Amino acid sequence: DRLRAAATKAGLKVDGQTRAELALEMFLAAPRVLSEAHSEQKLVRLTSFEHYGGKEPADMAKAFKPLGAEVQAAMAKALDEWFAEHNRGKGTARVGVHAIDGEYYFIIRHGDTFTRVAKVKEQKTEMLHFRPEKDDVGVYSPELNEIRIHAGTKGERDLYRREFGLRLFGDPDYFSKKKAYALDPLLADGSDALNVEGCGDLERAVLREYEVAFDNGFEEVVIRRARDIFGAAEARPVKGDAIPRGGRLVRASFDLYFAGKKKARKVQIRLPNTLKLGRHCDAQAVLWWLS
């Protein structure tokens, strides 16, 4: 569907009946359109993000204006200076934006630190020195007025958080507050905390695993797994708490079931603000469920 939508948007006439036929037609007619569609598909399949909320928890869907080419270029220049200072090369940063399902995916391509790799040919070893390219992603949701960032280091995440705040709203600290997820409702409300009403095609949520840390000086951690944590607790001969009291719930994993999908989608939350989604998971429905 994304390939066909990209072809229609670009004014291409295609009639391929399979994914392969459609991709081949687009490649022959407009390789760049196919490349951009492929990039979008990679973006929506990213699974691990850190989330930051805006200063005002308001719906910005109507007021938000996407960044123009000049602002994207200015952002790339500012990022490039940071990358040069941190051994990632100069003149490598590029910023592109893709509008996908009401959100704006910013892909940041830049150089990484130098790599040395051994190459062997005809029983001779040579060393290759090169700077690999790295892709990072920031996703802004106008409806939730929050940004989520996929990057390898804390320094890069802080950099993007400030730059997105500055370029989108003129304030580098606009996204300074980490959007903290709360797992306490699992303790307080039990299975009722898994209510999915009003979350689009999301039909059911099941708690599969949790991690509880005890601050007793012994670094004690309890991890429990089951096909259904709350269901397993109900089935025990001797009733007790599904999740032990007296500790801090620091991580939880869920199976989410969507309408028309047989296989559950995996979701993991690690406090305070890290969210990992399984492949093909509907990120927007999950974010609404967690809001």
Per-region residue spans from a language model:
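Intrinsically disordered, low-complexity, charge-rich terminal extensions
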Residues: D1-S291
